[in-house]
């Protein structure tokens, strides 16, 4: 069954929604943008999060030392890396105990990446859905992000067969997380699907 990450969590109501709906991963954005949270905010939200939900920190070209400081403070379990990341940096994070997601925005997936998960994303919270039929089936753990909503996630899972799906703005109403949309998204993503090879 596909895993679900709800990203861009900022408020206690967001945490309640993901706890209730049964998300697998919760995303805190440390990179600049409208969903950005501070370390203090992330720690406070983490206290409210169900213990079975793993936390992901979203970073853009952040120095390894800064990421490790946030991890060592207890705010995150996984680092999601946008921008340029070297194999040495990824390995350094992993050796410290972090799982690593490397993000590929509108570019070919690097199957030689050292990361634990490879993410394909339409880029920078654009809300644009990728050409799902162009995404190759790979043996590595794959995360699908960008433009997903409760209305299209089931088809996306069927077409791409990812390990995980990731959503932020697709479960928002007027710029705020919508508990009903979060529940619908997770239900649709995790609904029993018979995978078929779709040409």
Swiss-Prot record:
InterPro entries: Aldolase_TIM, PRAI_dom, RibuloseP-bd_barrel, TrpF_fam. This is N-(5'-phosphoribosyl)anthranilate isomerase. The keyword Ribonucleoprotein does not apply. Gene3D superfamilies: Aldolase class I (3.20.20.70). The gene is trpF. Belongs to the TrpF family. GO terms for biological process: L-tryptophan biosynthetic process. One of its GO terms (molecular function) is phosphoribosylanthranilate isomerase activity.
């Amino acid at each position: 069954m596909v895993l679900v990450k709800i990203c861009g969590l900022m408020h206690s109501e967001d945490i309640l929604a993901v706890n209730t709906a049964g998300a697998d991963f919760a995303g805190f954005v440390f990179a600049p943008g409208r969903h950005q949270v501070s370390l203090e905010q992330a720690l406070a939200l983490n206290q409210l999060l169900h213990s079975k939900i793993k936390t992901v920190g979203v970073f853009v070209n952040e120095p390894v030392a800064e990421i490790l400081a946030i991890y060592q403070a207890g705010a995150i379990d996984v680092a999601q890396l946008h921008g340029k990341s070297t194999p040495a940096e990824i390995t350094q994070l992993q050796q410290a105990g972090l799982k690593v997601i490397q993000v590929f925005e509108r570019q070919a997936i690097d199957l030689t990446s050292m990361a634990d998960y490879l993410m394909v994303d339409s880029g920078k919270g654009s809300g644009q859905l990728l050409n799902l039929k162009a995404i190759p089936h790979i043996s590595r753990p794959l995360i699908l992000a960008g433009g997903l909503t409760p209305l299209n996630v089931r088809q996306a899972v069927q077409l791409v067969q990812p390990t995980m799906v990731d959503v932020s703005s697709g479960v928002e109403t007027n710029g705020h997380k919508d508990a009903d949309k979060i529940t619908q998204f997770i239900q649709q993503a995790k609904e029993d699907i018979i995978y078929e090879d779709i040409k």
